[in-house]
């Protein structure tokens, strides 16, 4: 892709695996390469189960299981716009910068977390600081009810009966 200023963006797609066909890399006009780390709903569910099992083995952790601790292997069926394949962007990594070839970051430029329903929960910067947060209606999948930027007041949304 070439923009109006003559700068190019080249997109790279996964050839195989759980995210085959998805864009997993970008090279910009300056020659910088970025890796887009993608996850599937099943991978996020497995990570959740491992984290939960680890925390349950700790003597200090609570033993009760709430409905918020359920993380399904697949997303709920049916969205208004078609099936959701469950693939989500987990992190963006700078993997090559010609201006600094020996100084690549040891952390992602951005990291993203999701709810059990696949909705974006939080965005983190390269220092690991949460910079955005989102909340959703428990009874209406995907309906955002609040969001906030770090250090700023939360914005909340209310919906009438028609949505």
What are the functions of these language-model segments?
Residues 1-163:
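Extended charged/polar low-complexity repeat regions
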